[in-house]
Amino acid sequence: MKDFENDLIYYPNPDPVKEPRFILKSVDELEKSTKYSVTCNGTERVVYHTDSFDYVVVVDNEAYDLEISIHTPYEKLEIRPSSFGIVPSVKGETIHIHLDEPRKFTVETDGGLHDALFVLCSHRIEKPADTTICFEKGKVYNVGVLTLKSNDTVYIEEGAVVSGCVYADHCDNISIVGNGIINGSCWHLLDSNAYRFFIYAKWCNNVLLKGFTAVDGPSWHVVPAACDHVVIDDMNIY
């Protein structure tokens, strides 16, 4: 018989986390994968590690020539979803994949989903002219809770990491766009969920969420509650 309690990845009813548990001093403090390394079009990409999976964000406006090295032995390799028909070529510990357009897929070895690699390919998003909040490449921003107001446009540049949650209440015309990362791990204990929503907009009108990666949030990741005209486009939500 399956042991549901002991098989849980996250403990569903932890004590509330009332303040961010830690402050990141640089993007280098985020844990990196030891199992995978990835290059795209000859450029090495950062592969991050979470307690559930590894992931890499790949941004380009051209075709994607991917080299994925797997540094642990395996017998069976699967690329999912299988409906994409991605057939890699394999040479040693490196697999080669060519994509003519962005795809989001997983690399799984020996049926292991919990140590799979999520490959998240996207087109590059340029900085909007009306940007009011800009998070720049190569930097980490400890926002705690980023509270938006009407007409805010948040741009998260590729390579930027925003540590915290996002909240908007009764706002009009707000957007979060870019190719960077919002990481919510500071708002929950390891192996636990938490009571706080990750990206929470309530009673808002005209909301755009596009391109960025929302990972390791404390609870429900994207919650537009009682909002009108919400567009969620090409996000990576994990």
Set out the residue ranges of the language-model regions:
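Extracellular/periplasmic carbohydrate-active domains that bind, remodel
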Residues: 1-238
